[in-house]
Curated annotation (Swiss-Prot):
Residues 32-249 are extracellular. A lipid is attached at C273 (S-palmitoyl cysteine). The keyword NAD does not apply. It catalyses: Ca(2+)(in) = Ca(2+)(out); K(+)(in) = K(+)(out); Na(+)(in) = Na(+)(out). It comes from Rattus norvegicus. This is Neuronal acetylcholine receptor subunit alpha-4. The gene is Chrna4.
Length: 630
């Protein structure tokens, strides 16, 4: 009653089910047990009495052939300073052990098994050029054993192999690093190496961000060392790796080139701006800071070789330093003057004549020519003769001179006088002068207005016109003279007319438009053609020395000087002084301009020199790596 109440199946119903399950699982379990027992039996048979210290050869004179190969997984690092290459590789080894053979039919068709490598004999193949760490494989993985006695063992290893790294063409360098594998104990008579493949297996290679493997070739070598009489074989793998230069080009080479270009621009900057030395020092400071920043980028310095980029940086540093020295020298030349330096003849010849032609430089001369014309004109005006050496009756010459406006009579006024009323204009135009005797002009005649004085008559009683010179002489009367003469004017034009008898005549200016009138020729005295109001009374002039006169018949008397007033003398001396001063300044200015031009030529020379050197340095930096690669 209790069993029926719980609902459990009767034992008789469970028995057939258990029988069915047992009959179905027995074959599989028996097969697994049989194979496990087969491998166990195989291992017991193989390693019973097996000695892993002896070479796996039937005859002592036989040679164990070890097939060797290498598969690279990663190029970890290339240390230029310590001269070593770190790689992650798989060392492939394969040999035959006659003591580890069996018949698969005796062991449930077991053809291969995995066994610990510590239990079997292994060739002692090591990395000869190991730089750091263990020479041999440290991680002993299991070996794959086949029924014919073939053993395959592929342990992983991280090697630090020594490598002679040449960083001359950094960052465009290409290195050749080798890994030499061979038996450390057995010579060629005991163990011989056979290469599995001629190249390194790169199927599982993980690409590096800085290096790329161009080629990796394995070669078989034999060598007799000094320590031993035997010959030892080895397989050497040569890894040809190339650096990827993009990072270094952006962060190292381009800034160096830009700094070099800034150094070249120093010589293109004019010396007048005064910022040449500032630019040089700024470039030098920027280069110094840049060198401090890139010490971690470029390979660490060694005593073996110096990278081209290091030489280029050193060259740029010297470049900038020389530019500072040359700039100081150029500025010194630029600011030289005749008072401090005398320009040698060879400097003038080389830097003002020869070099500018070679550099296709053309010196502008407009300003210098203008200054020279100004000085020459002032000297002509100041140094002209103060007498008339030629006859004045030639109408053509006089007409041309007067038409050109070359005989102005400047107006000088007494500051104490004032002109309240509008006065007639007294000018000194060409006019007709009668023949006067000295006795006829001894007394002054009142002239109520200009031109109102009656023309004097000759000894025969008829007015006579002669050819004579007229000169408007500036005269500034003093207060006493003005009171005595009754003159109230800002200027007074006095005509000295020379008759045929050599006597000087005095007449007020009288405008005329007669075509036959005599035109006055200008002297070197300051004169003016400006009209000035005046109200004057003609007065007998002081005795003057006769000037050049025309004798009867057109002959010319010897030239005689016209006396000048003190004011005119001082004016002429002032003009002479100004002309001499301007001439001296022009000479100084010319010499200064020559020194400035010499400085410009020196700047241009070093500009082209630095451009050429910069281009050659750049080509020398980029070209050799490509030539070496070819």
């Amino acid at each position: 009653m209790a069993n029926s109440g719980t609902g459990a199946p009767p034992p008789l119903l469970l028995l057939p089910l258990l029988l069915l399950l047992g009959t179905g699982l027995l074959p599989a379990s028996s097969h697994i047990e049989t194979r496990a027992h087969a491998e166990e039996r195989l291992l017991k048979r193989l390693f019973s009495g097996y000695n892993k210290w002896s070479r796996p050869v039937a005859n002592i004179s036989d040679v164990v052939l070890v097939r060797f190969g290498l598969s690279i997984a990663q190029l970890i690092d290339v240390d230029e300073k310590n001269q070593m290459m770190t790689t992650n590789v798989w060392v492939k080894q394969e040999w035959h052990d006659y003591k580890l053979r069996w018949d698969p039919g005796d062991y449930e068709n077991v053809t291969s098994i995995r066994i610990p490598s510590e239990l079997i004999w292994r060739p002692d193949i090591v990395l000869y050029n190991n730089a750091d760490g263990d020479f041999a494989v440290t991680h002993l993985t299991k070996a794959h054993l086949f029924y014919d006695g073939r053993v395959q063992w592929t342990p992983p290893a991280i090697y630090k192999s020594s490598c002679s790294i040449d960083v001359t063409f950094f960052p465009f360098d290409q290195q050749n690093c080798t890994m030499k594998f061979g038996s450390w104990t057995y010579d060629k008579a005991k163990i011989d190496l056979v290469s599995m493949h001629s190249r390194v297996d790169q199927l599982d290679f993980w690409e590096s961000g800085e290096w790329v493997i161009v080629d990796a070739v394995g070669t078989y070598n034999t060598r007799k060392y000094e320590c031993c009489a035997e010959i030892y074989p080895d397989i050497t793998y040569a890894f040809i790796i190339r650096r990827l230069p993009l990072f270094y080009t952006i962060n190292l080479i381009i800034p160096c080139l830009l700094i070099s270009c800034l150094t070249v621009l120093v010589f293109y900057l004019p010396s007048e701006c005064g910022e040449k030395v500032t630019l040089c020092i700024s470039v030098l400071l920027s280069l110094t800071v840049f060198l401090l920043l890139i010490t971690e980028i470029i390979p660490s310095p060694t005593s073996l070789v110096i990278p081209l980029i290091g030489e280029y940086l050193l060259f740029t540093m010297i470049f900038v330093t020389l530019s500072i020295v040359i700039t100081v020298f150029v500025l010194n030349v630029h600011h030289r003057s005749p008072r401090t330096h005398t320009m040698p003849a060879w400097v003038r010849r080389v830097f003002l004549d020869i070099v500018p032609r070679l550099l296709f430089m053309k010196r502008p001369s407009v300003v210098k020519d203008n200054c020279r014309r100004l000085i020459e004109s002032m000297h002509k005006m100041a140094n002209a003769p103060r007498f008339w050496p030629e006859p004045v009756g030639e109408p053509g010459i006089l007409s041309d001179i007067c038409n050109q406006g070359l005989s102005p009579a400047p107006t000088f006024c007494n500051p104490t006088d004032t002109a309240v009323e509008t006065q007639p204009t007294c000018r000194s135009p060409p006019l007709e002068v009668p023949d006067l005797k000295t006795s006829e002009v001894e007394k002054a005649s009142p002239c109520p207005s200009p031109g109102s004085c009656p023309p004097p008559k000759s000894s025969s009683g008829a007015p006579m016109l002669i050819k004579a010179r007229s000169l408007s002489v500036q005269h500034v009367p003093s207060s006493q003279e003005a009171a005595e003469d009754g003159i109230r004017c800002r200027s007074r034009s006095i005509q000295y007319c020379v008759s045929q008898d050599g006597a000087a005549s005095l007449a007020d200016s009288k405008p005329t438009s007669s075509p036959t009138s005599l035109k006055a020729r200008p002297s070197q005295l300051p004169v003016s053609d400006q009209a000035s109001p005046c109200k004057c009374t003609c007065k007998e002039p002081s005795p003057v020395s006769p000037v050049t006169v025309l004798k009867a018949g057109g002959t010319k008397a010897p030239p005689q000087h016209l006396p000048l007033s003190p004011a005119l003398t001082r004016a002429v001396e002032g003009v002479q002084y100004i002309a001499d001063h301007l001439k001296a300044e022009d000479t100084d200015f010319s010499v200064k301009e020559d020194w400035k031009y010499v400085a410009m030529v020196i700047d241009r020379i070093f500009l082209w020199m630095f451009i050429i050197v910069c281009l050659l340095g750049t080509v020398g930096l980029f070209l050799p790596p490509w030539l070496a690669a070819c």
